[in-house]
């Protein structure tokens, strides 16, 4: 990895963020909507702040590299010694497992995280949602089967599940679970805290909304979140995961908080970062 390549990665990341904001959201660049006190997460100032963070992260990474660059060679030892093991392409291993390519995950994190935070903020501020009235209305419309028409819900078992939740008034408390769940997923992705887990619960909500017949932005967020889940080891490196993952570890690699050790200087989960 060289400084020039890092500059290219930074440009690609910034461009991808702009494309996502342009293609899958409306009005995120409007200068007359820079700040909304009643919808803070939707304020367009965050578009420019997040874009600036991507650029700053890229420039910082480039300046930290030696002028000669760093040789990156993903290991393929497992495929060579394990019978039946199929090795992944080098570019895929680098993208999902090398922190020097984590810049490319910033636009996905920022876009998906902001969408979740904005959706959650709207629900938290809505008194009708807080009482469960809005959710009850949504479920009622979803389970309805119009005469001669196509029901919103394709699968009968899911319609029965929502009907059960309606009959037992789950909406009185489940509305808060959804609202604050969206807020937490959004914050987790934006600050890079347990990105894989946050993205996973985001896909659970996307999947549930789609099963209930609501398309909206759910297919887009679901697809982008799947990639964040796959890249969980490095997607949050420019964020709190840089420190959280080595501390907490995984079921197959104990974190330093449980071993009483000192985190490595530039850590990744599952082992130390090789810089040569």
Predicted regions and their residues:
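Extended, low-polarity transmembrane helix blocks
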Residues: 1-181, 191-276
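Transmembrane-helix motifs of polytopic, lipid-linked glycan transferases
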Residues: 184-188
């Amino acid at each position: 990895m060289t400084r020039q390549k890092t500059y290219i990665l930074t440009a690609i990341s910034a461009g991808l963020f702009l494309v996502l904001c342009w293609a899958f959201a409306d009005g995120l660049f409007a200068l007359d909507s820079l700040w909304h006190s009643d919808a803070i997460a939707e304020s367009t100032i965050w578009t420019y702040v997040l874009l600036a963070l991507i650029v700053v992260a890229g420039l910082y990474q480039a300046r930290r590299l030696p002028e000669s660059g760093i040789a990156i060679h993903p290991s393929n030892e497992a495929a060579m010694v394990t019978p039946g093991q199929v090795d992944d392409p080098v570019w895929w291993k680098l993208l999902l497992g090398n922190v020097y390519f984590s810049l490319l995950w910033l636009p996905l994190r920022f876009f998906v995280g902001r969408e979740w935070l904005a959706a959650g903020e709207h629900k938290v501020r809505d008194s009708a949602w807080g009482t469960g009235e809005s959710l009850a209305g949504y479920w009622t419309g979803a389970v309805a089967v119009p005469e001669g028409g196509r029901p919103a819900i394709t699968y009968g078992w899911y319609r029965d599940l929502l009907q059960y939740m309606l009959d037992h008034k789950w909406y009185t408390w489940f509305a808060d679970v959804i609202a604050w769940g969206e807020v937490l997923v959004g914050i987790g992705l934006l600050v890079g805290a347990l990105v894989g887990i946050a993205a996973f619960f985001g896909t659970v909500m996307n999947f549930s909304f789609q099963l209930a017949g609501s398309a909206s932005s759910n297919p887009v967020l679901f697809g982008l979140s799947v990639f964040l889940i796959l890249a969980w080891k490095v997607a949050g490196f420019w964020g709190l995961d840089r420190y959280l993952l080595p501390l907490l570890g995984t079921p197959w690699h104990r974190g330093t908080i449980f071993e009483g050790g000192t985190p490595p200087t530039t850590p990744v989960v599952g082992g130390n970062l090789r810089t040569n």
